[in-house]
Amino acid sequence: MLTAMLLSCVLLLALPPTLGVQMGVAPLKGIRRPDQALFPEFPGLSLNGLKKTTADRAEEVLLQKAEALAEVLDPQNRESRSPRRCVRLHESCLGQQVPCCDPCATCYCRFFNAFCYCRKLGTATNLCSRT
């Protein structure tokens, strides 16, 4: 039993050198710069391509997106809008992002915001209620 255990320990200690695993400081002697440490056996590979930070890459992506948006949102090539960009009094303003045509009117909603229309609201603090 003891001989089997000693034999297995010797084999485990002798296995890494036979497989070519280099242990110790010897492989690190030829490394002078950090970019040589990645793959010293391949001189073409280095960390130069990996040195870009994520902030630089994110900035490049944002610049590309901004250029693409500038091309899409060119004001000369934009389609003409409809002439009416407001909601008249007593017309539905439900789900619309345009204001009421009358500056004294607001979008008034009833029945749990299911029915909305432009309406003049008269209050004492509202300057439009006097007219």
Curated annotation (Swiss-Prot):
Oligomer status and interactors: Interacts with melanocortin receptors MC3R, MC4R and MC5R.
Position of the signal peptide: 1-20
Alphabetized GO MF terms: neuropeptide hormone activity; type 3 melanocortin receptor binding; type 4 melanocortin receptor binding
Residue ranges constituting the Agouti domain according to the UniProt record: 86-128
Chain segments carrying region Interaction with melanocortin receptors: 110-112
Induction comment from the UniProt entry of this chain: Hypothalamic expression is elevated circa 10-fold in ob/ob and db/db mice.
This protein's domain notes: The presence of a 'disulfide through disulfide knot' structurally defines this protein as a knottin.
Gene name of this polypeptide: Agrp
GO-annotated cellular components: extracellular region; extracellular space; Golgi lumen; neuronal cell body
Recorded superkingdom: Eukaryota
Stated name of the protein: Agouti-related protein
Positions of the record's site feature: Cleavage: R81, S82
Keywords noted in UniProt: Disulfide bond, Golgi apparatus, Knottin, Secreted, Signal
Compartment annotation: Secreted; Golgi apparatus lumen
Biological processes annotated in GO: adult feeding behavior; circadian rhythm; eating behavior; hormone-mediated signaling pathway; long-day photoperiodism; maternal process involved in female pregnancy; neuropeptide signaling pathway; positive regulation of feeding behavior
Propeptide segments, given as residue ranges: 21-81
SMART domains noted in UniProt: Agouti
Gene3D superfamilies membership: Agouti domain
Tissue-wise expression: Expressed in arcuate nucleus and median eminence, adrenal gland (medulla), hypothalamus, testis, and lung.
Cysteine disulfide partners in this protein: C86-C101, C93-C107, C100-C118, C104-C128, C109-C116
